[in-house]
């Protein structure tokens, strides 16, 4: 149940509260209604006062059905419609009241209010003038005179708005229309005119807001739905564009412009949905191809080019193609320097390329625009660890492989280097010591990078063979001497070592 106070507030916002009181206190007996109709009217009045609008409406429906010539039944039903925000339904009832009882000034005054809000200024003025000629109460007379002055002001502003629009002064036209629409809030034509001004001024989202209101205020407003759809499309919001153009076709399935636009939006939407599904499945190369098709399908709207390149940048980054990712992400960032998604994806590509300073810079820029993003925070911490790590021992550099190298590449590089730096190949004592140190590093790199768990730790900026990195200090239990590597077979894939190194 709605509280009576809230109903009073809603009623008062629609028309003068005094008129509601007139309605509620008006005695139905004056119409000579039968007992059943009188019962419905009285019960409906009580329900309305209690805020039970739907139940009150049912009672007044019954009263109208029971006595189609009862002006009080129509008037009270109009009151409920207005309280429910259904002004379109209230207007015919008020007109019926006036037809049945020409001197019912309360109904005529209420209708004048509605007509004024709809922007039907001539009709509203006619009602207010007739109220003044019908022996109104003091309050009704004041209200009618006030509304006549307001209507006259709206006429003047409308003329100024149309002149400004015609001369191409859209800023002035908007200023005039703003004032009119504070009063004529339900005028669909004026909202459509202001939407055109917003479009001319490069403010499409404000235009959409007015057009959405116009689509509700005017029945079968296919033109509004078409314009909303095209505006969303130009903004790059293909999903909302598709939704709005479908509303147009629901009203008129043969609407030529809506149907042509529908086919274009649907084609683009299908490509984008397919590309996103491929990304979710990890099929980044195929997704890239789809987004290239998006750019070819709609080359004239820059928004689709930017969004497509943003997603291609993401695909290259996730597919560990850092050179391509950096190139495309940079193209996006030239157009949108604050694009957080492109900054994150380029930062990840920089990490693969071991460009840690650049990665840190991108993460920090992204964090300025989205400080609560956990992915950015973790990425920045990782980049900082890797920068610090790069200043120490880098197992990837030791083996001469990229950070995204496969295990097979790592083993191949290890075997080649282990053979090259085998200490038995060196006779000079100094060279042998250098080779021993080099061989230890090579073996350590192979041990870390060929083990998924140890490699992940290293990729996250932690050296699994460095006790200080793992424990914050102390000795290094994993730092091995040359003697500990004797018997290590660089050409074995696992199991007991059969190959022995021999020293003089």
UniProtKB/Swiss-Prot annotation:
Functional description taken from the UniProt entry: Involved in the unfolded protein response (UPR) during endoplasmic reticulum (ER) stress. Acts as a negative regulator of the EIF2AK4/GCN2 kinase activity by preventing the phosphorylation of eIF-2-alpha at 'Ser-52' and hence attenuating general protein synthesis under ER stress, hypothermic and amino acid starving stress conditions. Co-chaperone of HSPA8/HSC70, it stimulates its ATPase activity. May inhibit both the autophosphorylation of EIF2AK2/PKR and the ability of EIF2AK2 to catalyze phosphorylation of the EIF2A. May inhibit EIF2AK3/PERK activity.
SUPFAM superfamilies in UniProt: Chaperone J-domain, TPR-like
Signal sequence region: 1-31
Protein name: DnaJ homolog subfamily C member 3
Highest classification ranks of the organism: Eukaryota, Metazoa, Chordata, Craniata, Vertebrata
GO molecular function, one term: misfolded protein binding
Record PTM Phosphoserine, positions in chain: 274
Domain of life: Eukaryota
Tissue specificity remark: Widely expressed with high level in the pancreas and testis. Also expressed in cell lines with different levels.
């Amino acid at each position: 149940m709605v509280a009576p106070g809230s109903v009073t507030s809603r009623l008062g916002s629609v028309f003068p509260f005094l008129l509601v009181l007139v309605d509620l206190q008006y005695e139905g007996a004056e119409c000579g209604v039968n007992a059943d109709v009188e019962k419905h009217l009285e019960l409906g009045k009580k329900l309305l006062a209690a805020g039970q609008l739907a139940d009150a409406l049912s009672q007044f429906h019954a009263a109208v059905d029971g006595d189609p010539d009862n002006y009080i039944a129509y008037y009270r039903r109009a009151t409920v419609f207005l309280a429910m925000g259904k002004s379109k339904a209230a207007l015919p009832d008020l007109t019926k009241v006036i037809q049945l009882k020409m001197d019912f000034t309360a109904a005529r005054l209420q209708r004048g209010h509605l007509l004024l809000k709809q922007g039907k200024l001539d009709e509203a003025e006619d009602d207010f003038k007739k109220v003044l000629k019908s022996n109104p109460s003091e309050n009704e007379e004041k209200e009618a005179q006030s509304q006549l002055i307001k209507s006259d002001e709206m006429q003047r502003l409308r003329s100024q708005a149309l002149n400004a629009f015609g001369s191409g002064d859209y800023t002035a036209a908007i200023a005039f229309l703003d004032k009119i629409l504070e009063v004529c809030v339900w005028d669909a034509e004026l909202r459509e005119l202001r939407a055109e001004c917003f479009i001319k001024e490069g403010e499409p989202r404000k235009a959409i807001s007015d057009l959405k209101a116009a689509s509700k205020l005017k029945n079968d407003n296919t033109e509004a739905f078409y314009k909303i759809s095209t505006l969303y499309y130009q903004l790059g919001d293909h999903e909302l564009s598709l939704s709005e153009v479908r509303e147009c076709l629901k009203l008129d399935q043969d609407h030529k412009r809506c149907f042509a636009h529908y086919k274009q939006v649907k084609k683009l939407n299908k490509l984008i949905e397919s590309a996103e599904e491929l990304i979710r499945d990890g099929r980044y190369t195929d997704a890239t191809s789809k987004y290239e098709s998006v750019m070819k399908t709609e080359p004239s709207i820059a928004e689709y080019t930017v969004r497509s390149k943003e997603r291609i940048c993401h695909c290259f980054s996730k597919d560990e193609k850092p050179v391509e990712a950096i190139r495309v992400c940079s193209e996006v960032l030239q157009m949108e320097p604050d694009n957080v998604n492109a900054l994150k994806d380029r930062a990840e590509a920089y990490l693969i390329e071991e460009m840690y300073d650049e990665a840190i810079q991108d993460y920090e820029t992204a964090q300025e625009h989205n400080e609560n993003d956990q992915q950015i925070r973790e990425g920045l911490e990782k980049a900082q660890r890797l920068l610090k790590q790069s200043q120490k021992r880098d197992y990837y550099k030791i083996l001469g492989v990229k950070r995204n190298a496969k295990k097979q590449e790592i083993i191949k590089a290890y075997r080649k280097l282990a053979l090259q730096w085998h200490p038995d190949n060196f006779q000079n004592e100094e060279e042998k010591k250098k080779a021993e140190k080099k061989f230890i590093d090579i073996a350590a790199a192979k041990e870390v990078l060929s083990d998924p768990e140890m490699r992940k730790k290293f990729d996250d900026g932690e050296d699994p063979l460095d006790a200080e990195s793992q424990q914050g200090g102390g000795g290094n239990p994993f730092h091995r001497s040359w003697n500990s590597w004797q018997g290590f077979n660089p050409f074995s894939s696992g199991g007991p070592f059969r190959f022995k190194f021999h020293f003089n």
